[in-house]
């Protein structure tokens, strides 16, 4: 559990640093304090940090209407909640700005496929900059984009979110967008790791893929993204590969993502479809979203 909390606290440091940057103040803690903070957490608090909470929770101080979810705050240690908002072609929220009588929507950019068709990573980075600016203006900490799944099924209802059929193009353009978002002090979320390539049956599909195809096609774009950017988070996928859910797969999450690619950020579940919480945590997932109180209890019971 200690290893799972560390990436989350690093993300908190980045988001809190960003929050205070505008007024000259400094965050309450920095990376040197991580182990000290963890040592002060109770078992129940550690479990709650690994499970999201609804925006209606009384501890969440900054609500952004339409956000995808929040992490659980620990007020006694000045640990705030993290606000996560969906993408992929802009910040997906429905907020109202102070002293404005109307709802202030964010920009809807052209489809990610259209962006990829430019073959221009500078434009991808500029779009990321714009998304980061809008997230910053509304108080969003992490934007759940980009999606770089491979277009293998032309009937996939989310192909518009993805870049292309080619892992190299997808990886290079995805990395540029991530860098653009994070230039602004906002976190990006690289998704859906991996082989989430159709909507039909996506919650339970069991993808049977050869090791060569996994490495050369389905993992390659993610590898390129990780090595050319440093996304704050990576989001898992709903499906199975070879009979095992990807969000509880230590070969994918620990051996490849963590050890081979040296990824040190936060690994997040996809939203709503609850799995075996202990299996996911043991498999390498750090944060269960959007979170249910039962999941925190399951973590405590599994320790």
Task: Name these PLM-found stretches.
Residues 1-26:
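Bacterial Sec-dependent N-terminal signal peptides
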Residues 18-303:
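Glycoside hydrolase catalytic-domain context in secreted enzymes
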